[in-house]
Amino acid sequence: MKSCSARLVALVVRYSGNMSDLRDVIIVGSGPAGYTAAIYLGRAGFNPLVIAGALTPGGQLVNTTEVENFPGFPDGVMGPELMDNMQRQAEKFGAEIVWDDVVSVSNNDVTGVKTVSVDQGDVFETHALIIATGSEYRKLDIPGEAEYSGKGVSYCATCDGFFF
């Protein structure tokens, strides 16, 4: 078993500079959908690469206090804790995580290879690409919307409906 420092050096060497190697599967997004895909792919013998994002990995759940409607947590779970657990489970099954933002995706129509470039300059290639970038709230930009957000203005009926 490699020591932590040996693994860190291997990761730094592997992810430094402009490189391109064919990956089994690349998953763009580190929310529940991205990590679930990574877990199932890892268990199936693939080596998924998750491009998690540089600033807000973990999706919208990292900004959620208590998640009460996720199976297996009858007393609820904090959003960041749930996402940390999902990340660890994905890594347990062989997922590699890159903390960077995707800047471009292209497809070679002849070979079917998808090329994913990230902000730090690295380039990754794959035949299978999963886009799991989630969603964002659609705001109306009307007077009082920001002021009353969470105080009567809600963006998630299944999340907040019982409050009203």
Regions found by a protein language model. Name each.
Residues 23-93:
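Beta1-alpha1 glycine-rich phosphate/pyrophosphate-binding loop at the start
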Residues 7, 14-15:
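Short, positively charged and aromatic/hydrophobic N-terminal segments
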